[in-house]
Amino acid sequence: MHSSTLTPSDLGTFVRRVRKAQGLRQDQLAGVAGVGLLFIVDLEAGKPTIQVGKLLTVLEALGCKVAITPPTGTEEAP
């Protein structure tokens, strides 16, 4: 599954779909990722103020990779 997430809501929907595809409940994902259940609930609801570090931990627990692509015509940072 590939997705270009543009909003917190898009990201929440993406995480929910991947979680359900893996047969996990929200509490199970929270346990595997080492975050609280409320964080998963807020993430999947599209809360715009979630913590990026925890988000990355959840994505890693789901086996997802994050790629950031610089705008065309710009140099990549070293």
Regions found by a protein language model. Name each.
Residues 13-32, 57:
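Short basic helix-loop element that most often maps to the first helix and adjoining turn
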Residues 34-48:
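Recognition helix of helix-turn-helix/homeodomain-like DNA-binding domains
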Residues 60, 67-78:
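Short, charged recognition helix plus adjacent turn
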Residues 26, 44, 60:
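Acidic-residue sensor for enzyme active/binding pockets
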